[in-house]
Amino acid sequence: MSNMLEKARKYETEKIAATDPQTKPLFHVSAPTGWINDPNGFSFYDGQIHLFYQYHPYNREWGPMHWGHSVTCDMIQWEQLPAALAPDEEYDKAGCFSGSAIEADGKHVLVYTGVTRIKQPDGSEQDRQNQCIAFGLSLIHI
């Protein structure tokens, strides 16, 4: 696991412990902390329904996208799992954007858009999107 993903998971744990459960919705997925947007990777794996989503754990405003992760068996009660992806590689250091999830050869596989920023000759920056894949129990990048 990368340092950035480990840092995000530690931050989530701290924020969950400090959050009054009564402030969280009963029947909807919500991020443990920070900003949440685009749902991704809605999938069935290992007997559970998984929902991944883009989110920025460190602020309630848009920022470098991570992928949050929740599971359910009944589509009513959702369990928050640790972050699945963090922008921690050269090919996704500006964010882990939209993607999908499948089961392949018994593994949960995430395919997502990694974003990098490329400096242009005039000094401006341009986003470059890359197709990325993560797989396995801890969703290790390849």
Where are these regions (language model features)?
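Hydrophobic core segments of beta-strands in well-ordered, beta-rich domains
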Residues: D38-Y58, L81-A83, S98-S124, N130-F135
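Blade-loop segments of beta-propeller domains
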Residues: W62-H69, M75-A104
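Short, ordered coil/turn segments that flank beta-strands lining enzyme active or ligand-binding pockets
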Residues: Y45-G47, C73-I76
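Beta-propeller blade signature
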Residues: G68-T72, Q129-S138
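Residues embedded in well-ordered secondary-structure elements
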Residues: A18, A31, Y58, E90-Y91, ...
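Short loop/turn motifs at secondary-structure junctions and domain boundaries
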Residues: T33-G34, R60-G63
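Conserved small/polar residues in nucleotide/adenosyl-binding loops
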Residues: I140-I142
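N-terminal regions that are enriched for targeting/export leaders
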Residues: M1-H50, Y55
